[in-house]
Regions:
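C-terminal hydrophobic helical "lid"/dimerization subdomain
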Residues: 110, 135, 160-164, 203-254
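A general structural signal for well-ordered alpha-helical segments in protein cores
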Residues: 32, 44, 63-66, 90, ...
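Glycine-rich cofactor phosphate-binding loops and adjacent beta1-alpha1 units
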Residues: 73-77, 98, 103-106, 115-195, ...
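Rossmann-fold dehydrogenase core element
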Residues: 171-173, 184-223
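Mid-domain Rossmann-like dinucleotide-binding core that forms the NAD(H)/NADP(H) cofactor-binding site
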Residues: 46-131
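Conserved acidic E/D residue at the C-terminus of a beta-strand in Rossmann-like folds
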Residues: 109, 176, 200
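Glycine-rich phosphate/adenylate-binding loop and adjacent beta-alpha elements
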Residues: 1-43
Length: 254
């Protein structure tokens, strides 16, 4: 909480070796019965009365990622917002985009079970598969493309799809992590005058997201489709990795 970046709210860029991304990356994480958290006075938030552990489970991440992505995307009530990817992070991004009440939201996802999840829980959201996305967005936007695009998929083709589906002067927020370098074809993009926003989540809004959960404005519980005890955590990992049984997110009980 004392370095330049922490004081600016950019806590993921903390310059201390035990700050920022340390927990679960450079030091042991939270999948244990007891956890030691450096700088806990800065990095932990009290769960409000009336909010269960299960309701709060996704606040630190991936809800923090979705909230940050929606916040920096400058969404207005007149916007058409396209979200690429309907995995756990994509759905959390959707929940936080909905807080800004844009004119319409389109979710693009290739997995049929995840598309069905979106249709079942958020019927007001338009859905489309990647091969139809560009034409669908043009047909369902007011200015030839999405006003805001949030790239949450991280597939080989989704970065290009993101800027192709954006209207001129749109905002493209890249939330996804990629396995390899992406090409930025500047000659093709030049006339679109796009604004790109990228980077890791600054988990500094957890107190606000907990308040929104307490007020009933965010509900991530439907994302927790499976629960395992800590002694069977390897089974939960395998289920999640192989995307079996319609899994979205797995909870671990200690």
């Amino acid at each position: 909480g004392e370095c330049f970046f922490c004081k600016k709210g950019f806590v993921n860029n903390c310059t201390d070796q035990n700050g920022g991304w340390a927990l679960g990356c450079r030091i042991d994480g939270g999948q244990a019965e007891y956890v030691r958290v450096p700088f806990a006075d800065q990095g932990l938030n009290k769960i409000p009365d009336g909010v269960t552990d299960r309701q709060a489970l996704l606040v630190g991440d991936v809800l923090a990622t979705g909230f940050w992505a929606a916040r920096i995307s400058e969404i207005t009530p007149e916007d058409t917002v396209l979200i690429l990817g309907a995995g756990p992070t994509g759905i959390c991004t959707l929940l936080c985009v909905m807080l800004h009440s844009p004119k319409r939201i389109i979710v693009c996802e290739k997995d049929a079970s995840r598309l069905q999840f979106i249709r079942q829980h958020y019927p007001q959201v338009l859905t489309v598969q990647p091969e139809e996305c560009a034409a669908f967005v043009r047909a369902h936007s007011d200015h030839g493309g999405a006003d805001v695009v949030l790239e949450v998929a991280g597939a080989d083709s989704t970065f290009r799809l993101a800027w192709e589906c954006a209207r001129p002067n749109a905002i493209v927020t890249v939330v996804a992590l990629y396995d390899k370098a992406q090409t930025l074809p500047l000659p093709e993009m030049y006339g679109k005058n796009l604004t790109f926003k990228t980077g890791g989540v600054d988990g500094c809004d957890c107190e606000e997201t907990l308040r929104l959960i307490a007020e009933g404005k965010i509900d991530t519980e439907p994302l927790i489709t499976h629960t395992y005890p800590l002694r069977r955590i390897a089974e939960g990992y395998e289920l999640f990795e192989k995307k079996r049984d319609g899994v979205i997110k797995v909870a671990v009980e200690c």
